[in-house]
Amino acid sequence: MKSLLILLLAAGLGSAQNIPYPAARDLIARVQTHLKHAADFGNHGDVKKVKRDEKEIERYRNAQRKASDFDRNLSKGKFDKGELDSLIGDLKNVIEHNTLESQDRDALTDDIRDLRDFRAQ
């Protein structure tokens, strides 16, 4: 039984090593979490509801779509620098034009920095 457990654990670790771009995929997951949190601003807690216009909503959708597309391609082992640049541009649009809490603005700004660092590697 113990050897079976060790074998299963080793197989799991071996398959985890085959994931293309694991650090980048973790970064994209973090970006998506931060975008979702920012998009939820005004929809929970005691925060006065923020009226969203269609352009704000579309900026969130564009950034989430780009992040998802980029992650999908990374999972297939494909890295597209232009696609990453497009994602960074959409994140900048959210930061520059959407109503955000300071912590969300800071998190997304940090994400852009980290994406640029990844791109430079």
Where are these regions (language model features)?
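Charge-rich, solvent-exposed alpha-helical interaction surfaces
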Residues: 27-30, 34, 66, 87-90, ...
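Charged, low-complexity interaction regions
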Residues: 39-52, 75-79, 98-106
